[in-house]
From Swiss-Prot:
Keyword set includes Transmembrane helix: yes
Pfam families: AAA, AAA_lid_3, Peptidase_M41
Binding sites annotated in the UniProt record for Zn(2+): H601, H605, D679
Co-factor requirement: Zn(2+)
Ranges of biased composition (kind: Pro residues): 54-69
Bilayer-spanning residue ranges: 104-124, 267-287
Any one of the GO CC terms: mitochondrial membrane
Transit peptide interval: 1-47
GO molecular function: ATP binding; ATP hydrolysis activity; ATP-dependent peptidase activity; metal ion binding; metalloendopeptidase activity
Name used for this protein in its record: ATP-dependent zinc metalloprotease FTSH 9, chloroplastic/mitochondrial
Signal sequence, renumbered to the chain: none
Length: 784
């Protein structure tokens, strides 16, 4: 940018220094175009359009540094500044300032302004700002001006300058063309005509009826033709002279002339929009981060807080004494408690086990129906073990952000590694450990991290992972395999002895009346778990407090039991005494009938297993509901089995038929229930396996039948399966008739105790093993 541009940007002000040489100022018509939509002509072109090419001014030597003038000289400077700068300061005011001795202030200000102007001229004249985008068009135009002035006889460079100049100021194109000091060609003439149209100067050459002016456009075109006739170019047409050469006038939209301007504006607006969107995104991200951080405040467990990723460690020192649980507080699940006591003993005295090569189990999975005491067992381990205890709920791992669950798993095990040996307890692990599904990617990440931490490439020595769940069937097989969860401990519903121990535990800190029979309450609450019994005692205590009693009586406990079993009484509904007695009798009848039927059903299985060669030994018999079964007889093999004989398979068929046959013998053929459907399903599958896969049928022979046999073969297989089942049914009926007294004795023992072990079953049936079969009269007496 030249010094001429600097002289136009700043208004001339007087200076105590000698003024530098400057180019003549352009005229107002060249500085400001007529049309408001045109871009303003760059400053170097204003003098160019009015005076033509000028030789480049030689730079003047920099003046010496200014010295502060004396008062009289300052007065002269002020007067000069007032005259040349067009200031509004009156002479009287200046004289007052001089008299007051403040003229040096004006002189100093003038010197500062002059120095600023010289500095600005120096910056603008250099290439310091040439990298700015808005400076590039001016540089291009300045380059075209220099080329055109250096080659005035080159029409191509003159036309290029006129074409570029037409984008900024068509008036300057007209003035430069009409100076006749440069060579032109047809393209230059076209740019000149375009400038006339843009500035509406073409109207001066058209006829005017009001003034009587004739058209001079043909003369203009003839003149333009003569200007280009001497150049090596295509012959210039003379339009408008005849019909064969008409004059084509194109109306140009003023908006089209600012195409480059609009392009620059679009780029500028795009950049502004991008910057605005970026700022909004940054501000939104900052606000979101601040909001997330606020979720993790004091007492919160938000995603943004560091405490949300740190595991919870049980500190017995700050816990109330009543909240610290031990194995003494766990009743009704002796088998599960015994296995967990071994783990605690291992943690307290590891040398006792390691001397024989024993290793600490990596994982313990507690399963069972709700309310059986799985979490209570974990609390007892936390109270008994002398090692750190970390705990998390399965639902605490996942949140709305992907990756949070895996990070919390890593944080949990990192904290556990620092304090090993320790125990990590995850309650309701099915929330994160369920079978992996394709559409649950975030849950899979959490489960994968848990699998790696439990048994991955890096070994976690000294960390025992405990977990509790009510739904073990939906857990991922990779999680429940040995090496991750080595022990699966089932916490069942308590039996009669367990319920009695639980009731005594909950009643020990309460005043109890002497008429309360804990054993009777335990026998009258079959199917109750620990949570139900705790609720029973609590309801009875509230009832006693409402009635104002000093002690818990049997009436309050009976009321609580009835409320849990039958619900709240509807006292608003009137029922007669006869209806009450009938309903109570029916309820007791159905309950007792169901229990008696279940007891005989399970006793039938047990008696057949005891008296059939090849059957597995009995482990336990119970009439407590287990899953979908009302009762169960479990059998365990005495040793590992690699192959099974036909005798053993037939014994299994007989055991499956024992329950249905017992129901038919005791209650009659018409009173057989659907409780044996699972037994029949198992027996049918076993018989079909013997016939189709093992070749244990004389009618079919030693043949392995494929999955889809022919119709004839399938009918023969079905007939043989039915034959095996009927033969087993007949054998079992004869056996139970022979040992019917054992059946009655075992059923009565189950009704009394609900659960019997193998030794207890043998003690019950042993006195009746050698006695003969009962007569019909004795059978009726036994039933009564």
């Amino acid at each position: 940018m030249s010094a001429l541009q600097a002289s136009l940007l700043l208004r001339p002000l007087p200076s105590p220094l000698p003024p530098r040489r400057r180019l003549p100022l352009p005229s107002s018509s060249a500085s400001f175009p007529r049309a408001g939509h045109h871009r303003r002509l760059p400053l170097p072109l204003r003098a160019l359009a009015s005076e033509g090419p000028q030789p480049a001014p030689s730079p003047a030597p920099d003046p010496p540094p200014p010295e502060l003038p004396a008062a009289p000289e300052a007065e002269e400077v002020v007067g000069t500044a007032a005259a040349e700068g067009g200031g509004k300061v009156e002479e009287e005011e200046l004289e007052d300032l001089v008299e007051k001795g403040r003229a040096w202030v004006l002189a100093l200000a003038a010197a500062v302004v002059a120095a600023a102007r010289r500095f600005f001229d120096w910056v603008v004249s250099g290439d310091w700002m040439s990298w700015w985008p808005f400076w590039r068009p001016d540089r291009r135009l300045q380059r075209l001006i220099d080329d055109a002035d250096a080659n005035p006889a080159d029409p191509a460079k003159q036309s290029a300058l006129l074409h570029e100049l037409n984008k900024f100021s068509p008036e300057d194109v007209i003035k430069r063309f009409e100076q006749r000091s440069h060579a032109v060609d047809s393209r230059g003439v076209a740019e000149y005509l375009r400038a006339l149209i843009l500035t509406n100067g073409i109207a001066d050459y058209l006829p005017d009826e009001q003034s009587g002016r004739s058209a001079s456009l043909p003369a203009l075109l003839q003149e333009l033709k003569q200007r280009v006739s001497g150049n090596e170019d295509k012959p210039f047409m003379n339009p408008g002279i005849s019909e064969k050469q008409p004059l084509h006038v194109v109306m140009v939209d003023p908006k089209a002339t600012g195409r480059s301007t609009r392009f620059a504006q679009e780029i500028f607006s795009t950049v502004l929009f991008t910057i605005a969107v970026g700022l909004m995104w940054v501000m939104g991200a900052a606000a979101l981060q601040k909001y997330i951080g606020s979720l993790g405040g004091i007492g919160a467990s938000g995603v943004g807080s560091s405490s949300s990723y740190s595991p919870k460690e049980l500190n017995k020192d700050i816990m109330p004494e009543k909240n610290v649980k031990t194995f003494k507080d766990v009743k009704g699940c002796d088998d599960a408690k015994k296995e967990l006591e071994e783990v605690v003993e291992y943690l307290k005295n590891p040398s006792k086990f390691t001397r024989l090569g024993g290793k600490l189990p990596k994982g313990i999975l507690l399963t069972g129906s709700p309310g059986t005491g799985k979490t209570l067992l974990a609390k007892a381990i936390a109270g008994e073990a002398g090692v750190p205890f970390f705990y998390r709920a399965g639902s605490e791992f996942e949140e709305m952000f992907v990756g949070v669950g895996a990070r919390r798993v890593r944080s949990l095990f990192q904290a556990a590694k620092k304090k090993a040996p320790c125990i990590v307890f995850i309650d309701e692990i099915d929330a994160v450990g369920s079978t992996r599904k394709q559409w649950e990617g975030h849950t899979k990440k959490t489960l994968h991290q848990l699998l790696v931490e439990m048994d991955g490439f890096e070994q976690n020595e000294g960390i025992i992972v405990m977990a509790a769940t009510n739904l073990p069937d939906i857990l991922d097989p990779a999680l429940t395999r040995p090496g991750r969860f080595d022990r699966h401990i089932v916490v069942p519903n308590p039996d009669v002895r367990g319920r009695q121990e639980i009731l005594e535990l909950y009643l020990q800190d309460k005043p109890v009346s002497s008429d309360v029979d804990v054993n009777a309450i335990a026998r009258s609450t079959p199917g109750f778990n620990g949570a139900d019994l705790a609720n029973l005692v609590n309801i009875a205590a509230i009832k006693a407090a409402v009635e104002g009693a000093d002690k818990l009586a049997a009436a309050q406990l009976e009321f609580a039991k009835d409320r849990i079993i039958m619900g709240t009484e509807r006292k608003s509904m009137f029922i007669s005494d006869e209806s009450k007695k009938a309903c109570l009798f029916k309820l007791l009848y159905f309950i007792l009938r169901e229990l008696i039927l279940t007891a005989y059903h399970e006793s039938g299985h047990a008696i057949v297993a005891l008296n059939t060669q090849g059957a597995h030994p009995i482990h336990k018999a119970t009439i407590l509901p287990r899953g979908s079964a009302l009762g169960m007889v479990t059998q365990l093999p005495s040793q590992d089995e690699t192959s099974i004989s036909k005798k053993q398979l037939l014994a299994r068929l007989d055991v499956c038929m024992g329950g249905r046959v017992a129901e038919e013998l005791i209650f009659g053929e018409d009173n057989v229930t659907t409780g044996a459907r699972n037994d029949l399903h198992t027996a049918t599958e076993l018989a079909q396996y013997m016939v189709s896969n093992c070749g244990m049928s004389d009618a079919i022979g030693p043949v392995h039948v494929k999955e889809r046999p022919s119709v004839e073969m399938q009918s023969r297989i079905d007939a043989e399966v039915v034959k095996l089942l009927r033969e087993a049914y007949g054998r079992v009926k004869r056996l139970l008739k022979k040992h019917e007294k054992q059946l009655h004795a075992l059923a009565n023992a189950l009704l009394e105790r609900e659960t019997l072990t193998a030794d207890e079953i043998n003690k019950v049936v042993h006195p009746y093993q050698e006695e003969p079969q009962l007569s019909f009269q004795e059978e009726d007496f036994a039933l009564t």
